[in-house]
């Protein structure tokens, strides 16, 4: 958190480092051991730092490789909640890592990618053929592209493509210069569920569709279901994509509405059993359920 080379390069928030060191010093003092000047010096340095509106968070994958994200320190920033990583994204990534055969050599479309944790983790561990990150808020898309680059995926000069997913939509094709043969084709797409058409979705042709924490409002639910119906309708001769949605159940009524609306349009669903242990550190209190949908 403080002296690790990764955290020195990409420091966590000032508040977090201050709290961490304060608690560590308390625990050290409670052992009656010799004081460690290094801890006090580090805390003094942090106390003199100004708070920033942005910080970094790093998560270690089972391989030991990190996923590092630049995040907002505020839950709501720039009129959106999409500039931080939510627990559902962590749990969906964990499920994907434990079930990587569902993604290997396949084209994945992520709806509501936010700042990119789930997709970056999948791209680093599950070896998809192609991965389409999507969102609709300009600030989120900008931060998403930055985080993809931050994790070793670099936008190739001259390879940026403009594909109309809505009137001002844009996709950015990215690749990793370090291992180009092993890495998926990456796309960042501006995607508005309400205005996108079946014709515009034809180019994507995903084998797998995923989303995390996108079921929180009745209007969003209807737009999401409409989006899934469009994806089902434009599959041409291919079979329908597999769909996995990680839902944080904050309001049971909203969750039940989602299930009822799925039933109403004939989209089947089942609850995927929860994993037994956590790969990433997250709050175990939120009730996150992963659903498989059959469109």
Predicted regions and their residues:
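S-adenosylmethionine-dependent methyltransferases
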Residues: 1-295
């Amino acid at each position: 958190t403080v002296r690790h080379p990764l955290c020195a390069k990409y420091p966590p928030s000032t508040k977090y480092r201050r709290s961490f060191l304060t608690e560590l010093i308390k625990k050290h003092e409670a052992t009656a051991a010799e004081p460690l000047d290094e801890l006090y010096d580090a805390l003094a340095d942090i106390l003199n730092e100004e708070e920033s509106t942005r910080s970094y968070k790093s998560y270690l994958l089972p391989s030991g490789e990190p996923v590092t994200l630049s995040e907002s320190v505020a839950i709501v920033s720039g009129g959106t909640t999409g500039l931080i990583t939510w627990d559902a994204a962590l749990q969906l990534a964990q499920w994907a890592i434990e079930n990587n055969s569902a993604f290997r050599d396949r084209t994945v479309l992520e709806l509501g990618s936010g700042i990119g944790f789930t997709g970056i983790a999948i791209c680093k561990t599950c070896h998809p053929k192609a991965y389409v990150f999507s969102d609709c808020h300009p600030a989120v898309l900008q931060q998403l592209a930055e985080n993809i680059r931050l994790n070793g995926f670099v936008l190739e000069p001259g390879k940026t493509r403009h594909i109309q997913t809505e009137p001002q939509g844009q996709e950015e094709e990215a690749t990793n210069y370090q291992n180009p043969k092993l890495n998926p084709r990456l796309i960042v797409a501006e995607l508005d569920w309400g205005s996108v058409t079946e014709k515009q979705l034809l180019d994507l042709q995903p084998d797998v569709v995923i989303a995390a924490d996108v079921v929180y409002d009745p209007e969003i639910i209807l737009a999401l279901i409409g989006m899934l119906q469009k994806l089902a309708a434009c599959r041409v001769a291919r079979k329908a994509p597999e769909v996995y949605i990680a839902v944080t159940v904050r309001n049971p009524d909203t969750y039940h509405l989602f299930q009822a609306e799925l039933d109403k349009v004939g989209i089947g669903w089942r609850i995927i059993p929860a994993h037994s242990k956590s790969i990433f550190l997250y709050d175990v209190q939120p009730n996150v359920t992963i659903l498989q949908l059959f469109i």
